[in-house]
Amino acid sequence: IPQENRREFFELYDAMENELMVLDTETRQLERDMRRDTTAGDMQLESALTAIYSQKLKEGEIEMRYARELKRVLTPRQLLQLKDAERRFNRTLMRQHRRMRSANNSSPRR
């Protein structure tokens, strides 16, 4: 990323990540609330499920909106490389998480 575009890139990218994090936090809170609420009726649960399953759509909408803005500071190739880097990073994190969980489950307990 050229030096003159870095600041704008990070401002946009951080704003996008913050929006995605808020959405994820709200969705996880809704899931917890519905699990704990033993009095919730089917209508409430259906409404919550719709919101939970809609999270991916909302994430996509946020990413598309920011992709349009990021095109001002990144080339299409750079945007593609960014998406690839995000995917590889997440895959690496998941592998490490699975390895750690597997190691913890196989260690002897006292």
Give each language-model segment a name.
Residues F10, G60-R110:
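Amphipathic, charged alpha-helical segments and their helix-to-coil junctions
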